[in-house]
């Protein structure tokens, strides 16, 4: 019977300890300056530049000569940096 209690204690303790590591999913926005932005060029530049981030999407404004890149990024800390905004714990 003592072994059962010891086993339950170890399982509960490991669950509490592992729940201390929180992961956050954050939305981010960043821009890249280009000479003559097009939809295809912006898609290529966004995917090349931000390979470490997930769900990279893109848009462009030809008047500003910039490609806008946005998507989601998984972080261990929810601190805003690198254009990161709106973090939610996952």
Curated annotation (Swiss-Prot):
* Superkingdom per UniProt: Eukaryota
| Record bears the keyword Chloroplast | no
Q: Which GO terms describe its molecular function?
A: toxin activity
Q: Where in the cell is it found?
A: Secreted
Give the UniProt keywords, A-Z: Disulfide bond, Secreted, Signal, Toxin
Which tissues express it?
A: Expressed by the venom gland.
Tell whether Disulfide bond is among the UniProt keywords.
yes
Report one GO cellular component. extracellular region
Processing after translation: Contains 3 disulfide bonds.
Family stated for the protein in its record: Belongs to the scoloptoxin-15 family.
The name of this protein is U-scoloptoxin(15)-Sa3a
